[in-house]
Structures are given as C-alpha cells and as structure tokens.
Amino acid sequence: MKFYKYCASGNDFVITNADRKEDRSALAKELCNRYEGIGGDGFIVILPHEKYDFEWEFYNNDGSRAAMCGNGSRAAAHFAHHINKINPNMSFLTGAGIIKAKVNQDKVEVSLGKIKSVQNTFEELGKTWQLCDTGVPHLVHFCQNLDEFDTILCQKMRQKYNANVNFVKILDENHLKVRTYERGVEDETLACGTGMGACFYLAFLNKKVQNKVKITPKSGEEVGFTYKNEELFFEGKVKYCFEANYNFS
C-alpha cells in the first residue's frame, strides 16, 4: 500500500487512496502505532465520490472511527490537490457533513460549517465546563493558567461525556492558547483543529474575543480562525512529510 505522511499544526496523519469502502480499523491501529508502524494521530482514506471531489474515512490512532477532524481535513485537502490534482477549491464528504476547502500552496483553509450544538455551562471536578459540538464533541474549560491541564482529570471527563477535553487561556481579544486531550488518541496531542474551533466559538459567543483570532496549540504552530455568516473557518499551514510503501503484517 502506498501511503503519504502529513503534518498539520502538530497533528500527524497517514493518508492513502482507495477505491471502495471497508472496515480499516485494524489497519489504522497498525499504521498509527508509533513503535511498530508508521506513527500518526489518525489514518485518512481518500475515496471517489460522484457528487463531491472525494469522500473520506477517518480513523483515530486507536482504530476507532471519527466523523470529523479539523487538522485532518486540511491535510486531506492538501493531499487531494497536490497529489491527486483536484482543484484547489474543493468540497468533500465526511461523517460530519460536507467540508469546503481552499488550498493555496502550503496553506489550507477549511470551513467547519455551522456549530452543531452548544450546551449550558456546568461545574464538575472543581472546574467550569461547556460542551460544544464542532463535528465532534468538545468539553471546554477557560483557565488563567494552562498548567492547570491535568491528564487524569481529562481522562475522567472524556470517559464520562465521551468527548474531547480542552483547556483554553485567552491572551487578548485576538489570541488564544489551547491544550487538548483527544479521545481516540487517549492522550494530550500537539493540536486539535475542532477543539481549537470549539474554544474560539465559545469565547466569541461569550463576547471575550473578536470574530477573527489566532490560536496557539501545544505544538506552537499558530493557526487562524474566523467566524462569519454563521460558519467557522480554520486556516493554517500543512506539511507533506514523505511517501513510501507499507507491507501489511
């Protein structure tokens, strides 16, 4: 199998083309293993589609399926344009709906669409939380110090609510810093696009930031978010790392 390794904002992905749908959970787990496989936060399979430029299957590091991945969608769009020679303005089908993307050399902007749902704030484990669905569910806690991030606490919240867990610090009305514990990876990752989107949207909804901000994830790779016409737009650089062939075990 020919595969391509991509990185976006600190998340890394294994991407390949396929001509039909099938359950690739075991393969995803094997490929994403950082000790015995290629290593990655996710596995993306690009499939043909009659109506849209393509359709994807997205698998988490542990082999579970995910409806959406923000950084994964940007990596997929970069791959589709630069490798599969698809038009730089494209739309593709995910489990969370249609994603629109624009590729400009190494920069990719995607629309995460309309926010699926937002729940009221609540208190748990000594912290204030809010749940926001940006294609996948995210718990968000606003804090003054990102050192509050606690993996064990995140594990408890993730298991109870079946959601990703984010800690966010507002630096000013145009800049946020975010740390995310991702389900499916079951650990903190260097970045999470849908998580950053959830943090930005809730901050904007609560009138703490402008409708256009920069966000710095743990990786330090700054990305941009904009909210306009009830849609959430996400832009940042994408890196093609390498391509190779993989022999199945």
From Swiss-Prot:
InterPro entries: DAP_epimerase_AS, DAP_epimerase_DapF. Pathway: Amino-acid biosynthesis; L-lysine biosynthesis via DAP pathway; DL-2,6-diaminopimelate from LL-2,6-diaminopimelate: step 1/1. Its main location: cytoplasm. The keyword Translocase does not apply. One of its GO terms (cellular component) is cytosol. The active site is at C69 (proton donor), C192 (proton acceptor). Keywords: Amino-acid biosynthesis, Cytoplasm, Isomerase, Lysine biosynthesis. Its EC number is 5.1.1.7. GO terms for molecular function: diaminopimelate epimerase activity. One of its GO terms (biological process) is lysine biosynthetic process via diaminopimelate. Pfam families: DAP_epimerase (PF01678). The keyword Cytoplasm applies. Substrate binds at N11, N60, G70, N71, N164, E182, R183, G193, T194. It is found in: Cytoplasm. Catalyzes the stereoinversion of LL-2,6-diaminopimelate (L,L-DAP) to meso-diaminopimelate (meso-DAP), a precursor of L-lysine and an essential component of the bacterial peptidoglycan. Belongs to the diaminopimelate epimerase family. PANTHER family: DIAMINOPIMELATE EPIMERASE, DIAMINOPIMELATE EPIMERASE, CHLOROPLASTIC. Homodimer. This is Diaminopimelate epimerase. It comes from Campylobacter jejuni (strain RM1221). The gene is dapF.
